[in-house]
């Protein structure tokens, strides 16, 4: 393959390599994705997102984790896709529809100086709480809210939520003191999660204010996870720890999440372009 043009972008530290595939059907093997995502020998990222044409929406995001595995969707990633298509002149709409592996999502662009996108609000749709649809191998189809399971000798309470991708939300006393990198991969690959799972460790900082660390399926600990923040908001409300409008601090920045009366979850946060370049793959 000739030199591959790319743009690196980040949403509160959740960084991906974005490849404009609207003019050519560009595809990479899992090994190539691993190579360019490597932080020592490649560009360095949490994964790769291809921006493609869509028959269902205005554009499609085709997402892969840094280990080369595919993923349905990324909340921070979709904000960056929205910024890319507007800032690079692929659309002049401030409300484009973007197809993801979790369905077509509507975004609302907040334009700043230089006619560039600063913030993006995304209607993330309704949370899924039915165990078999998350999926979780569970004893019944009742929502899994504050249920206990054992991992590495610890009894942990978790709430299971899908925002188009699966999340296990666990509230702990102090995220920074919790062994996220030790426990996270054990939960990710626990047999009750047949497609593996993203894990959120959450500490209550105040009224409707959480601090979140995320162990992402296929990527390890990341600085942020937008779908995870949405799942945390839902779990916080279902467990009586918060209302439906929540401020969530992550290691890379802050997101505002609202679980609306319609049942949809609205996520608002920044999106930034870091640099563009070419790489041999």
Curated annotation (Swiss-Prot):
- Its primary localisation, in coarse terms, equals cytoplasm
- One Gene Ontology cellular component annotation? cytosol
* BP term (GO), one: lysine biosynthetic process via diaminopimelate
Q: What is this protein called?
A: Diaminopimelate epimerase
Q: What is its EC number?
A: 5.1.1.7
Q: Give the family from UniProt.
A: Belongs to the diaminopimelate epimerase family.
The record's listing under PROSITE patterns reads:
DAP_EPIMERASE (PS01326)
Q: What class of enzyme is it?
A: isomerase
Q: Which UniProt keywords apply?
A: Amino-acid biosynthesis, Cytoplasm, Isomerase, Lysine biosynthesis
Q: Where is this site: Could be important to modulate the pK values of the two catalytic cysteine residues?
A: 167, 216
State where the protein is found.
Cytoplasm
